[in-house]
């Protein structure tokens, strides 16, 4: 029987860093259909509007009954407001199966660092290692995720 992760194993940097979260790059329509059939519930897309889109993902996800959220991440949006929105979306998806993607997994890895540290209790080194496994390559994006986590760590009970 297919699992949500196995249906997406061919996307760039496919990874399942935590139960309930599958990450990677851009899926195809067929992969989204298989993800839904295997129990997928929601898609969080952090690509910028200017990026090439091989399919109308909103239309496809609506047809499939998948929740679809877009929070664009680009050079001008590496701020706390954007990270707050991403973390809210990831937290709201808990207990459901989420596909969290960008074009390659690079931005997703960075955006998950605060989730790993603040919500999962990981040490910074482990959070960064997990983010690299997800697809993080950019030092600038890593700094965005780490700095956010460090500033907000005191906000946690």
Summary of predicted features, one role per range:
Residues 1-99, 113-157:
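Cys-dependent protein tyrosine phosphatase-like superfamily
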Residues 102:
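Short cysteine clusters
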Residues 108-109:
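Catalytic nucleophile loop
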């Amino acid at each position: 029987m297919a699992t949500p992760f196995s249906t997406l194993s061919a996307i760039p940097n496919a990874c399942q860093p935590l139960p309930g979260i599958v990450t990677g790059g851009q899926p195809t329509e067929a992969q989204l259909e298989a993800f839904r059939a295997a129990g997928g519930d929601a898609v969080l897309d952090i690509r910028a509007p200017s990026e090439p889109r091989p399919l109308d993902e909103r239309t496809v996800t609506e047809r499939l009954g998948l929740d679809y959220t877009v929070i664009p991440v680009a050079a001008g949006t590496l701020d706390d407001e954007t990270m707050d929105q991403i973390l809210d979306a990831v937290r709201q998806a808990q207990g459901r199966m989420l596909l969290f993607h960008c074009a390659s997994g690079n931005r997703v890895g960075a955006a998950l660092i605060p989730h790993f540290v603040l919500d999962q209790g990981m040490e910074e080194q482990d959070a960064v290692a997990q983010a690299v496994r997800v697809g993080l390559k950019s030092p600038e994006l890593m700094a965005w995720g780490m700095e956010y986590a460090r500033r907000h760590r005191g906000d946690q009970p």
